[in-house]
């Protein structure tokens, strides 16, 4: 018989840097999950990624207090800010541009994100990422 699901927990944790402090500890502790076991498993799974990049994770907690988790790719906004070399997007994206990204940078981000996007092919994924860039106040070259 399948295990009964008790809860889904969605968090953003920095790759390779999960520890029992907030937000991880309180979110898992209230469901009775072994926090250190999650931290070790998460850090092992994300060790190939660039340390410090926020990584969305969905944790499924079962009624016997066991868990499974699935990691997603880093949010597009974080990757775009890194590519453009900025710390935050524009408060007025239509009138005030804060940086520029090229088609090559968009393609690199789209390849990273393609598994999590609903785009049919790489070109559609690039257009999706370009739209995110424009809404952050970035100029998009070559699209």
Swiss-Prot record:
Instruction: Fill in the PTM field for this protein.
Output: One or more lysine residues are methylated.
What processes in GO biological process is this protein linked to?
Answer: translation
A GO molecular function term, named singly, is: structural constituent of ribosome
Which residue positions does the secretion signal occupy? none
Gene Ontology cellular-component terms for this entry are: cytosolic large ribosomal subunit
Cystines in this chain: none
Sorted alphabetically, which CDD domains does this protein's record hold?
A: Ribosomal_L11
UniProt keyword annotation of RNA-binding present: yes
Q: InterPro entries given for it?
A: Ribosomal_uL11, Ribosomal_uL11_bac-typ, Ribosomal_uL11_C, Ribosomal_uL11_C_sf, Ribosomal_uL11_CS, Ribosomal_uL11_N, Ribosomal_uL11_N_sf
Keywords of this entry: Methylation, Ribonucleoprotein, Ribosomal protein, RNA-binding, rRNA-binding
Q: Which SUPFAM superfamilies match?
A: Ribosomal L11/L12e N-terminal domain, Ribosomal protein L11, C-terminal domain
Q: Which family does it belong to?
A: Belongs to the universal ribosomal protein uL11 family.
> What is the purpose of this protein?
Forms part of the ribosomal stalk which helps the ribosome interact with GTP-bound translation factors.
How this chain assembles, per its entry, is: Part of the ribosomal stalk of the 50S ribosomal subunit. Interacts with L10 and the large rRNA to form the base of the stalk. L10 forms an elongated spine to which L12 dimers bind in a sequential fashion forming a multimeric L10(L12)X complex.
Q: What is this protein called?
A: Large ribosomal subunit protein uL11
